[in-house]
Amino acid sequence: MDDIISLKNIDYSYYGKIQALKNINLLVKKGEMVGIIGLNGSGKSTLLHIINALIFPDSGEVFFKGNAVTEKSLSDKSFGIQLRQSMGYIFQNPDIQLFCPTVFDELLFAPLQLNLPIKTAEDRAEQTLLFLGIEYLKDRPVYMLSGGEKKKVAIASVLTMNPDILLIDEPLSSLDPKTQTFFIDLLLELNHAGKTIVFTTHHLDLIDHLQPKVAVLSEEHTIRKTGTASEILSDEEFLISVNLIHEHVHKHENGEHKHYHSHYVFHKH
């Protein structure tokens, strides 16, 4: 697989004072699924923002398909369009993303911004509604949607662009168990279809279900370890050291035993 995203020695701070990322190195290959896991405040969302060129690092380099991503390179219209067409970003809070009067308007917005013919945009929107099983929401005002419905519409609005890469910030945030299962199955299906997916999470269970390549962000805002899901999840001492699980000790008459808990657990039904 070819490297589609490359980050080299990335540092980023807010207002030049608050360190958010430190010496980040990460490779994402075409067709990979990559899970960035860490506690709240470790820099996960900031890292996605840098990959998507919403912000630029203080130092270090970002590459997309071998080309440097900078404010200057994005001023080249053809490269800027290529990057924006290739990447779709789903925010943790869908209310940030959704602003059109109706669901169908939301799905039309991105294709029309890419100058697709109106008929092509409408066809894509209809197909995406059917693919996600939300055609019944087509004419619904966005403000009337539930949290789970908004999340589905947010990802639908990105899929109408047919991006090669999906960047998803906390895909299971504020979702009920049934909708969590829907998104787990959807991510697996999209990756199986060839989409490159980079997501952030603090759910170890999600890593276990999706089995992506994993990058662990520490509370010091560095990538402490990368590896397969099984390599990361089986290293209990490491997970304790980055505060992703904690140890419980139970004492009995005949001794004691230890077991481990994730700080964040969801249940798949």
What residue ranges belong to the model's regions?
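The feature captures the beta-strand-to-loop junction immediately N-terminal to the Walker
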Residues: I37-L39
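Helix-to-loop junction immediately C-terminal to a conserved catalytic motif
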Residues: N52
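Conserved ABC ATPase "signature" region
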Residues: K119-L137
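Conserved ABC ATPase signature
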Residues: P141-L145, E149
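H-loop/switch region of ABC-family ATPase nucleotide-binding domains
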Residues: T201-H202
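H-loop (His-switch) and adjacent beta-strand-loop-beta switch element
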Residues: V214-T228
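ABC ATPase nucleotide-binding domains
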Residues: S234-H269
